[in-house]
Design a protein with these regions (language model features):
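Surface-exposed binding/hinge segments that line
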Residues: 93-96, 100, 135-177, 197
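Ligand-site clamp/hinge motif
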Residues: 181, 210-255, 382
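Structural transition elements
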Residues: 309, 313-346, 364-367
Length: 502
């Protein structure tokens, strides 16, 4: 597998059981007349506007499916459905994919979404300016060809379950080839919305694409408003300044929205593994006994209760329950402080160990950090807690790897392969794990599931990290907003399902 210099982890495998795939488009949630403006509260601002060249889940959250479209997309159940492609076929040898584009599809400029546009977009995603995460998604691809105006043929150098799934995310976005400006300041997509403006630190504004080729945008304007203080975000929804909070980051406040005449609360699942990550180049953390000791020393049930109001599922490895290869591995390291102390003694740290814990200033980071400081102190581990703004976390932790331990929610779908990347920020190298992922990607559907289960168990046994819990999806909306989805299983906050009851 290719190495990666920088990655915020995306997408792994999709079991393919099709030779021809064609589905209907997402249903219109209703015929309501759209209100003029939709105000959305969130806490994770984009790091930039170009999904091909910047890392950070906040960018795709706003732009994917809304401004930029893909040949295929994920619906709220995690199923792959057509978007710009009407359908696709796969050859018997699993090496050739043929996509037929929707003849109605066009960019906001009015230009048609042509096969040449798709080829140019995919080649850009394979180029040197793309993040290594994006380029790695295209590693199995040999050639990309436009055989006519509406047909794209992609050949692979090896079979890959992962590759088609990648097309549903940022690696698969299609951009207008006629655009010669700066993707970091303007948009050139085919989605129902266009980028309008960005007041950094406060607001990203989208406007309706009046020339949209599909179901028209139901809002003239969408404002993603960003709050560092979750209490302030809650207050904005309660006072009517917001129409929706994408994910309630103070679950203990859910009772504030119990008036069903004013609000609707939607609880579902995410891909967001809250990971206590280890820098495996740290001398102490390079030792299995130390990593296992930390896993034994943490009472994850108590952590979820104390920091996330008991809402959060224990998983035990880098696999959410929505993936076909999920196994509950949460009891691999039951809470056992005496066992933790024994392992630390074996590793040579009987007299104590000091580590830096650097966390992002997101809702979960500081509170979980404080919990861990107190709990690990009970087994002789001193944590020096350092809270960073998310941009600084990306710089110091994710890019420069200046940390010992960190906490972050990896929200990307099917992101097991982050642990197989040579140059990822937690510096984990395990050839047996890498081989299992390669065998899963090129094997049969049954082999894929079996190999990925084995890989997840290997990660857990090796204590490659401590998977604290899986974030729930708790979306709270004004009662006048319909079409709110329970689950968040892609990187997008898909506006196409939302409408106003007014």
């Amino acid at each position: 597998m290719r190495t990666a210099r920088r990655w915020v982890g995306l997408l792994l495998t999709l079991a393919l059981a099709l030779s021809v795939a064609a589905c209907t488009r997402p249903a219109d949630p209703g015929g309501e007349e759209p209100q003029r403006v939709l105000n959305i509260g969130d806490n994770l601002e984009p790091e930039g506007l170009d999904m091909i060249t910047v890392s950070g889940a906040g960018t795709a959250y706003v732009l994917l499916y809304n401004v930029y479209e893909t040949l295929l997309k994920l619906n709220s159940e995690g199923e792959t459905i057509p978007l710009l492609a009407q359908g696709w076929t796969r050859s018997d040898d699993l090496l050739t994919y043929t996509f037929t584009l929707d003849p109605k599809a066009k960019f906001a400029s009015g230009a048609p979404v042509s096969a040449d546009a798709v080829v140019a977009s995919f080649e850009r995603a394979r180029g040197e300016k793309a993040t290594n995460q994006i380029r790695s998604a295209w590693a199995p691809v040999d050639t990309i060809t436009a055989t006519d105006a509406k047909t794209v043929v992609v050949t692979l150098s090896r079979p890959s379950h992962q590759w088609l799934y990648e097309l549903t995310g940022p690696a698969g976005i299609v951009t207008d080839p006629a655009y010669t400006g700066d993707f970091s300041t303007e948009s050139a997509g085919s989605g129902p919305y266009e980028f309008s403006s960005w007041d950094q630190g406060s607001l990203v504004q989208l406007k309706a694409n009046e020339a949209y080729w599909g179901t028209p945008a139901r809002f003239d304007e969408v404002n993603f408003r960003y709050y560092a203080d979750p209490n302030a975000m809650n207050a904005a929804l309660l006072s009517g300044q917001l129409d929706l909070i994408t994910n309630l980051t103070l679950p203990q406040t859910i009772s504030e929205f119990s008036d069903t005449s004013r609000f609707s609360v939607h609880e579902g699942v995410t891909n967001g593994e809250v990971v206590l990550g280890f820098n495996h180049e740290n001398e102490a953390l390079s030792k299995l006994e130390v990593r296992q000791a930390i896993n034994y020393a943490i009472d994850r049930k108590a952590l979820v209760k104390a920091t996330w109001a008991g809402r959060g599922e224990l998983i035990g490895s880098m696999v959410p329950p929505t993936d076909p290869w999920f196994e509950d591995l949460s009891n691999t390291y039951p809470f056992d402080q005496e066992k933790a102390k024994e392992l630390l003694k074996e590793a040579g740290y009987e007299k104590g160990l000091t580590l830096r814990l650097r966390v992002p200033a997101l809702a979960y980071g500081p509170s979980i950090g404080r919990f861990l400081v107190a709990q690990l102190a009970e087994v002789g581990i001193t944590l020096e807690l350092d809270t960073l703004q998310f941009a600084d976390w990306l710089d110091f932790v994710f890019t420069k790897r200046d940390y010992d331990m960190t906490i972050v929610a990896h929200v990307e779908p099917r992101d097991m392969r982050t642990f197989a990347l040579d140059d990822y920020y937690w510096n984990y190298h395990n050839e047996a794990y890498r081989k299992l992922l390669e065998e899963a990607d090129t094997g049969t559907d049954e082999e894929q599931i079996a190999k990925l289960k084995e890989a997840a168990r290997l990660l857990a046994d090796d204590a490659a990290a401590d998977w604290l819990f899986l974030l729930p999806n708790i979306t709270v909306a004004s009662a006048k907003i319909s079409g709110v989805q329970d689950n968040r299983v892609s990187l997008a906050f898909d506006l196409t399902t939302l409408a106003s009851r007014d």
